[in-house]
A protein has these predicted regions:
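An N-terminal alpha-helical hairpin/helix-loop-helix interaction module that forms a charged
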Residues: 1-106, 123-175
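Helix-hairpin-helix
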Residues: 100-118
Length: 175
């Protein structure tokens, strides 16, 4: 996918020193409905509602913070959901440290992380990026599962709600 290529060849590549605005804007259009250059009918993952300057800063900050970029790569590649949840918790914890905190990355609603997970692998990650919207959907359809939106860690909420919704729709006969 374009997002995987961007992550591997731009974010993680030490020889690619600077992210160009147009490179980030292309990825922003994949992630965010309101990204610069998106038009009605454009395909996108979510409505991040992050302004272009903040989006560019977020990706440049990730690129310039090798430990966080590596944790995110590990999150994308981890197939065990429990381990993935732990890595997400580690990302949230590490991103709280000043002065290197990356704004917009680890939010209470987890929208940027969930959008990136979906862009990385849309077959295994849902495009409902907001945890609040996931909770509303789970409640509405009464999907079985054990996501505790009040007490689970950020990582647990992200991976459990993703799986709960996928399994819930499968139980309704949808693939």
């Amino acid at each position: 996918s374009k997002f995987q290529d961007f992550w591997t060849n731009k974010i993680l590549n030490p020889h690619h020193k600077i992210l160009a605005e147009d490179e980030i804007d292309e990825i922003a259009r994949i992630l965010d409905k309101r990204a610069k250059g998106n038009k009605p009918g454009s395909v996108h993952v979510a409505n991040l509602n992050i302004n272009p300057g903040a989006m560019r800063k977020m990706f440049n900050d990730i690129k310039n913070n090798a430990p966080l970029a590596k944790i995110m790569k590990d999150i994308f590649l981890e197939s065990n959901q429990e381990k993935r949840g732990g890595l997400i918790d580690q990302l949230y914890k590490n991103n709280k440290k000043k002065p290197r905190k990356i704004n917009q990355l680890t939010t209470p609603e987890a929208i940027p992380i969930n959008a990136m997970l979906c862009a990385w692998d849309p077959k295994k990650n849902i495009s409902i990026a907001s945890l609040r919207h996931r909770e509303m959907l789970i409640d509405h359809f009464e999907f079985e599962g054990d996501t505790d939106f009040k007490n689970d860690s950020d990582g647990e909420k992200i991976v459990k709600s993703n799986d709960q919704i996928i399994n819930g729709f499968k139980s309704l006969g949808l693939k």
